[in-house]
Amino acid sequence: MANSTHTELVQTNGDALWTFLRDKEEWAKLIPGYLSHEVQSADEMMWEFKGNFGVVEKAVKVQVKIKEIIENKKIAFDLEGISDNINGEGYFEMEEVEEGKYNVIGNLNMKAGGFLAAMINPVLEKYVPQTIEQHVQAIAQHISQATV
């Protein structure tokens, strides 16, 4: 399973950061390669994004199911491939470093299944770290600009 965690420091108010992280529609729009999303319920949504998987660039659809919310701390989710046999999980977490400064931590795990797994999993080893790094950077930049 491809796994990566990325952390960015942001200067912001904790309530503003949690409000943003709690609203999955907000951070869905910041996914690298974002194409669209659709909210299906309070705990489920569908993401569609364009991923660069080595020599192939393609649109991928995944079902996102919120599995855990720790208020003012963490939101965790499961991913289930709709268009492809790629599943995983992830989370976003906020950690106060000092007053007005927070680490935004993002984690993503993805694994391909099926007959193409042997080809896709090595590509995910490169894709997952790049994706979570870019996503957390985009979240940090968005939060920083919103609080200026």
Task: Name every feature range the model reports, one short phrase each.
Residues 13, 42, 71, 97-101:
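Short strand-connecting beta-turns/loops that link adjacent beta-strands
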